[in-house]
């Protein structure tokens, strides 16, 4: 992100695109903290990275950063047909524009937004100890506040964040794990 801003004409806004020779470089449109991307022919990639004084990302570090920002880096297919885009933080990730276009689920998404009915949201979770299992419930003081949807190295859960029993600083329990959000 910082390196991108050193280029001529670069702007500090997600998705902003500049051109290097004929190839685009752009800040990740979901979150500028994910850095910039260069779309280029593989044959020119390493020479261009060297000339621009850039480096490719370490995949594990990138996945960890994505997870910490609430962006699902892996196992996205586990969310299919389980959530609305607005529950997956698509609005915050610049994936929903309420001013234009038609898309699948538009009516439900607009209704949720308009009536302020968004009560659950996808959150990254961290395992303190134990083991997670996809589909299991998450509890705070015996009250269910969510469900584990992704149980991999970068786990996510659908959390009822407006529930009075949800405190983002608290530790929560599943059947076999202690977690935090």
Question: How does the language model describe each region?
Answer:
Residues 1-69, 139-140:
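Acidic, low-complexity central loop/insert segments
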Residues 11-13, 18-24, 94-106, 152:
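Hydrophobic transmembrane alpha-helix bundles
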Residues 22-40, 81-101:
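The conserved catalytic core of RNA pseudouridine synthases
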Residues 36, 64, 75, 81, ...:
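Conserved active-site beta-strand-loop modules that form the wall/rim of enzyme catalytic pockets
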Residues 48-51, 78-79, 136, 168-170:
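Short, charged, solvent-exposed linker or helix-capping segments at domain edges/interfaces
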Residues 58-60, 65-90:
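Short, conserved active-site entrance elements at the starts or edges of catalytic domains
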Residues 86-96, 106, 110-181:
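Glycine-rich, small/acidic residue-mixed loop/short-helix segments
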């Amino acid at each position: 992100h910082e390196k991108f801003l050193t280029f001529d004409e670069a702007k500090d806004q997600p998705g902003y695109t500049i051109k290097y020779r004929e190839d685009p470089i752009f800040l990740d449109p979901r979150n500028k903290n994910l850095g910039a991307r260069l779309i280029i022919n593989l044959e020119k990639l390493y020479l261009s990275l060297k000339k621009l004084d850039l480096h490719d990302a370490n995949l594990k570090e990138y996945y960890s950063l994505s997870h910490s920002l609430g962006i699902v880096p892996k196992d996205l297919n586990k969310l299919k047909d389980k959530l609305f885009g607005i529950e997956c933080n698509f609005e915050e990730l610049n994936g929903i524009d309420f001013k234009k276009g038609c898309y699948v689920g538009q009516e439900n998404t607009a209704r949720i937004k308009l009536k302020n009915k968004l009560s659950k949201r996808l959150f990254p979770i961290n395992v303190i100890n134990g083991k997670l299992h996809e589909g299991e419930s998450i509890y705070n003081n015996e009250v269910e506040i969510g469900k584990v949807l992704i149980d991999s190295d970068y786990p996510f859960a659908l959390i009822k964040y407006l529930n009075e029993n949800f405190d983002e600083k608290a530790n929560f329990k599943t059947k076999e794990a202690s977690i935090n959000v």
